[in-house]
Amino acid sequence: MNTMIPGSDRTPTISFSDGVFSITGRSYMENSAEFYAPIKKLLENHQGMLHVEIGLDFLNTSSSKCLMDLLFIVDKKYVAGNDCKIKWSYKIDDEDMRDAAEEFRDLLKHVPMEFEEIDD
């Protein structure tokens, strides 16, 4: 199943195709739980390989919790034997996003997670 949700100035661009889930842009909408609920269901129902690519510029507190919920799903799928990994890209000078990525990594117990610093 292929899914594409275009982003806005407050919502991230989401794409999901052939086991690759990508989230880029900014995430600071009013009701993060409502926005992420169908994405959570999509990940829960997905079978097989699941590679996550994160490239966020900004993430508010409620979006952060929703993203963590999504990544816990990926972690559980990895433990169940699925081919899963997470790649988090952030701008080389964005210490806040780097710190957020490292905090997420510390909370995830199993799934491999790599970081990529990118130029502006």
Residue ranges and their predicted role:
Residues M1-A37:
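STAS-typified acidic loop motif
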Residues A33-K40, M49, I54-R105:
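Amphipathic alpha-helical interaction surfaces in cytosolic regulatory modules
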Residues L43:
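Extended lipid/amphipathic-ligand handling interfaces
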Residues F115-D120:
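Short acidic DE-rich linear segments
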